[in-house]
């Protein structure tokens, strides 16, 4: 990806992006879902899971349709623990950052986050019908 913010580890580096996607803290995914798995090395208690995303529709960057979180103790069998739907309007002109989060008491070693891409840039958009981008700067595990 052109926007890789230092590679896979960037999504768990505690470095938050600004509403300027050109700042090097954003991971960009073009026309694909974002699927990221974090290994905590051992089973840990978790109270909150979140993914931080950016929308800048003038640059073809849209919020995911939804973000789903999964947990596992073995890294193979994952259980869904929550889905967060997007409620940010695609027509918002200014860049906006939003955290898709769930508050739930969990215990797991592996966390998987799946952010579903939009089907295509909306009909009213200059890029109508073309794939959009998903930009994420952090996966939050508390």
Indicate residue ranges for each PLM-predicted region.
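Predominantly extracellular/luminal regions of secreted and cell-surface proteins
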Residues: 1-17
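Aromatic, loop-rich ligand-recognition surfaces of beta-strand-rich domains
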Residues: 16-82, 94-142
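Short proline/glycine- and polar residue-rich coil/turn motifs
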Residues: 87-94
